[in-house]
């Protein structure tokens, strides 16, 4: 049989004449999920699987492979999908996808002496905490700092020791710490829309 990255062949013998015929099986080239990142909304997330051989032909679910999904698939977390090949194909492939926490938004950013105070909307469902990011660049390409807030009930943070009269851009996102493969990992929402603030003397 063929496998991922390996061509296979089928040998058939003619019952009438005794001749053998060998035909090739193109190797499996791509195994992919329809989506690898979802946003939590309480619903079950089940990405579809697509398998193609090196000639671009789609393999058939059920005939060429089977797919096993984990239980649940509702809460924020990382999930494994196992693909087992069968028939003219052999081997297994495991793919992963994330259900990420729902994001939040900035309420306001108030200038202070060489600093600012940021406030955001609470998002306590399926979250652990927040990340606050501020930068002198509107695209957060340079001079960017990140602050971790470990409690999801906290909705404000004061930041100091900044440059006076300088404009800063501030944004926030949520995160949740989950276990996967015996390790703790953090999954993040997308960033909120940034708010600008000009620092006081």
Residue ranges and their predicted role:
Residues 160-180:
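Beta-strand-rich modules
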Residues 13, 80-84, 169-175:
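Extracellular recognition modules
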